[in-house]
Regions:
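Acidic ATP/Mg2+-coordinating residue in the GHKL
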Residues: 109
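Conserved short strand/loop->alpha-helix "switch" segment adjacent to the catalytic nucleotide/phosphoryl-transfer site
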Residues: 47-69
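Glycine-rich ATP-binding loops of the HATPase_c
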Residues: 153-171
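Short beta-strand/loop element within the Bergerat-fold HATPase_c
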Residues: 89-101
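Short alpha-helical Gxxx[C/S/T] motif in the catalytic ATP-binding
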Residues: 142, 146
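Short beta-to-alpha transition helix within the HATPase_c
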Residues: 4-8, 21-44
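Short conserved segment of the HATPase_c
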Residues: 114-126
Length: 207
């Protein structure tokens, strides 16, 4: 087990292979950023995955905005999904989709979900999704910052699913799912526009 975990962390085993689906992220900033986040996740015994619908190309016009929002959502997911050493690896799934000049981000995790009665409370400064809602020392700022930055460019970040309920046939509780909408942050290339058009003309054909 120790050797398997070492392979996973160093990227030499099946769990440490290149982030599957990364070829669908053709924007250079996001490509490098997600690759680095996958490595960070492995160090925390968390597997980062890309959702099947992930597809983005072009050039970010607001790379700091996008990577800050995405980074905080991914970090939050890693924190929620990471468990004790020797336990099952956690999972974080990220989906990044281009819609014209808008970037849509969805981040879900295998953690315990949001415990607050009002899931929106998780965006208050000093609050975290980890056990012990209010965190001293200035932590618990990531989600609040992500929402503030998204709203600054006319977008938003919200909780799509608070998770934590699970099902009768599933012993593992479902984690939280966050969505971010960031308008005006992507300059589509001519190739991206052509691909979008061809996909519309040929349903069922994916890049």
């Amino acid at each position: 087990e120790a050797l398997a975990y070492l392979d996973e962390v160093t990227g030499t085993g099946p769990g440490g292979a290149l982030l599957a689906g990364l070829d669908n992220v053709r924007e250079p900033h996001l490509h490098a950023f997600l690759d680095a986040k996958a490595a960070q996740a492995r160090e925390r015994r968390v597997v980062l995955r890309l959702g099947d619908q992930t597809w983005i190309q072009g050039v970010l016009t607001e790379p700091v905005v996008v990577t800050t929002v995405l980074g905080n959502l991914v970090d939050n997911g890693i924190d929620a999904a990471s468990g004790p050493d020797g336990g099952q690896p956690g999972e974080v799934e990220v989906e990044v989709i281009a819609d014209g000049d808008t970037v849509l981000v969805t981040v879900g995790d295998s953690g315990p979900g949001i415990a607050f009665e009002d899931a929106d409370d998780v965006f208050a400064e000093g609050v975290t999704t980890k056990p012990g809602a209010h965190v001293p020392g200035g932590r618990g700022m990531g989600l609040a910052l992500a929402r503030q930055i998204a709203r600054r460019v006319g977008g938003d970040v919200w909780v799509a699913d608070a998770g934590g309920r699970g099902s009768a046939d599933d012993d593992e509780p479902g984690g939280a799912v966050f969505v971010a909408r960031l308008p005006g942050v992507l300059a589509p290339t001519d190739e991206a526009e052509d691909d979008s058009y061809s996909q519309t003309d040929e349903p069922g054909v994916t890049p």
